[in-house]
Regions:
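Polytopic transmembrane helical bundles with strong interfacial aromatic enrichment
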Residues: 1-46, 50-143
C-alpha cells in the first residue's frame, strides 16, 4: 500500500525538518524565541511528519494484515500527510493560513473514520503449514 511508503517518506522528512532548524535552535531569540508563533509552528510541522507518518504506517499495515482496502481513506491520509506540514509552515510566516488547519485535520479524521468502517467487517486469518486457516489470536506457536 502506498501509505507505508508515504510513512517512511514522512519519517525521513521529519528527520530533515528537525535537523535543519536544529542547527539554529541554540539561539534564544531565533525566530522570536522558544515560545514564538513561528517557532511553535515549525516544531508542529516537524512532529506532524512523524505523527501522520505513524498513522499512514498503521493504516497501510493494518490494511495489509486484514486484507482491507479503503482507497478513499488512503487518499485522505496521504492528503493529510502533505497538507498538515504545509499549513504549519505557511502559518508560521503568514498567520492567516492558520484558518486552513481544518483541511489536514478533517482529512486525517475522515480517513480514520472511513478506515474503521472498512475494517468493521474484516476478519483476519492465518494459514498454517497444512493450509488450515485459523484466527491469529488462537494460533499456537511452537518454540
Amino acid at each position: 500500500m502506498i501509505n507505508i511508503t508515504a510513512a517512511w517518506i514522512g519519517f525521513l522528512l521529519g528527520c530533515i525538518s528537525g535537523a535543519v532548524p536544529g542547527l539554529f535552535f541554540y539561539g534564544y531569540d531565533w525566530l522570536g524565541g522558544y515560545t514564538s508563533w513561528p517557532r511553535r509552528l515549525i516544531r508542529l510541522a516537524h512532529i506532524s511528519f512523524f505523527g501522520i507518518g505513524f498513522l499512514n504506517l498503521g493504516l497501510g499495515l493494518t490494511g495489509n494484515v486484514l486484507g482491507v482496502e479503503s482507497p478513499i481513506a488512503s487518499i485522505l491520509m496521504l492528503g493529510g500527510a502533505i497538507a498538515m506540514p504545509t499549513v504549519c509552515y505557511a502559518s508560521a510566516f503568514r498567520p492567516a493560513f492558520r484558518h486552513l488547519f481544518f483541511i489536514p485535520a478533517g482529512s486525517v479524521t475522515a480517513a480514520i473514520v472511513l478506515f474503521i468502517a472498512s475494517v468493521g467487517g474484516a476478519s483476519c486469518s492465518v494459514q498454517d503449514e497444512h493450509g488450515t486457516l485459523s484466527s491469529p489470536l488462537h494460533t499456537q506457536v511452537e518454540l
